[in-house]
Design a protein with these regions (language model features):
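Midchain, well-structured core segments that form catalytic/ion-binding scaffolds
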Residues: 1-56, 66
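Active-site-adjacent substrate-binding region
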Residues: 8-18, 28-29, 76, 84-134
Length: 174
């Protein structure tokens, strides 16, 4: 547990954390710490908008771990990186009609469409890399993944209207 604590204490301060970055800045974020005196596990999420920066963040995390382990010569650690979410833009750019249709559906449902990047991972990213280009559209939700997460009935209705319009657009263009 001491080693895990030292690893956490030596993560970059003032940069590369969700609370100190914004927009298209990536981050390294510990999500779970479990352990006892003989074994500890730390789970992180690493997010960024390019594969190169994701690799840089993973290398930085490995460097922190390696540096800390030098202080504990009789200990060992492993770092396992599992791909979770990548930037779906590279897939969506190959299928521009998918985004165009979504934007049109939003307009048809009576709203002004805007395009934004999000910093979290989404199912749309996984689906896009599995061969089903899938941009994120709005749900109307607020304060995602927190105890105050909510969505209004009116926003849910607009989401449903958008989805109906989207299905109609795909049928019209088929």
């Amino acid at each position: 547990m001491k080693i895990a604590g030292d690893i956490l204490a030596n993560l970059p301060i003032g940069r590369l954390s969700p609370e100190t970055t914004s927009g298209k800045q990536g981050f390294i974020h510990p999500t779970t710490v479990e352990g006892s005196s003989e074994k500890a596990v730390i789970r992180f999420i690493i997010r960024d908008f390019t594969d190169e920066k994701l690799n840089d963040h993973a290398a930085e995390l490995r460097a922190v771990m390696d540096t800390i382990l030098k202080r504990y010569p009789n200990s060992k650690a492993t770092l396992e990186i599992k791909e979770q979410y990548r930037n779906m833009k590279k897939i969506l750019d190959k299928h521009p009609q998918v985004v165009d249709y979504a934007l049109e559906a939003i307009e048809r449902a009576g709203m002004k469409a805007t395009r934004n990047s999000i910093r979290g991972g989404t199912d749309g990213s996984r689906l896009s890399f599995m061969g089903l280009p899938c941009p994120n559209i709005f749900t109307g939700g607020h304060a995602f993944h927190g105890p105050q997460e909510w969505v209004s009935r009116q926003d849910m209705e607009k989401t449903v209207q958008t989805l109906v319009e989207l299905v109609q657009i795909w049928e019209e263009r088929a």
